């Protein structure tokens, strides 16, 4: 069954088939989720030397899968580390219901969450764009022209991002988030004090390691790091997927926020 025919399936199929693969930190060769690709096993990520742009920087462009938390952000913590969440926010998290997940209601995932659909990186000299197939076909723009964060930001789903290169790693600094999105299916929270620093390193032609430092003194006792791996999807293109056209099943989701 190809992707175009799967897009019309109910959200239940999408969620149920996806998380087992997408929530893993480093899926070896992920099976495409319903609504986002053929159910046949995806080809192995290509190997070989990393390509470069004419300006000498690493070429990060292409269609990728994964690279961030889906089911549980703790999957990205280092072995033995625990989430430094404040007790009052743990109570809020424990009370959350799956039906209230903004992502399940066709709203953006925010940062650093990924939905279980492909996404694309586009690079220019002045901007890097992240284009997302899932939900509302949203995008992030990362300013690469040396500007600073404005002092009067209105809170938004993806915040305000500025990028720079440290050797072969793209470093993305983001502030100005709203507090409306969840970090994952289980409702891990944040506040408008959230500040993220993402480090994108293309270790091979088909592998992109994304390390994110999360600093949110409103909800956590200290900054912490998560690491996830995205795999290149050679030959893939992003499809038009309008979540609002196919979201009738969300009204049947019940119970506490959890991994499906």
Model-predicted segments: where are they?
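PEST-like low-complexity, intrinsically disordered acidic/proline/serine-rich tracts
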Residues: 2-260
